[in-house]
Amino acid sequence: EIYTLSLHDALPISSWERNRSFVEAFLLERMPRVKLKHPQGTFIFWLDFRDYGLSAQELQRVLTEKAGVALNPGISFGRQGEGFARLNIGCPMAQLEEGLSRIFKAFETL
């Protein structure tokens, strides 16, 4: 099961800020090897997985096959995006929690 956000869903700013704080705390506490590139004026985070030493293809395989989540591959934005994935935090908190928990489980054995 892969989670996505319907085109008709919308979040108030307070929800977006709560989601941002949740992602920051989750990564710091549970996945400190994943660095967060803070967005400027957007609800899309760049997650830096380079510390795992995976190729762009390996990173996508772990995310989609092991974690069952679909993130935008950073490599789609050029070679400088290799090792990164883009996370949309403009979704309900339950989806964000589920997705990050799946990513955590997939990466804890790497």
Language model segments and positions:
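Hydrophobic C-terminal alpha-helix "anchor/cap" residues
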Residues: 27-28, 63
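Short beta-strand-to-loop capping motifs
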Residues: 47-51, 89-91
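Single conserved hydrophobic/aromatic residue that forms the stacking wall/gate
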Residues: 1-9
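A short, small/polar-residue-rich loop/turn motif at beta-strand boundaries
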Residues: 55-61
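Short amphipathic alpha-helical/adjacent loop interface patches that line ligand
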Residues: 13, 20, 100
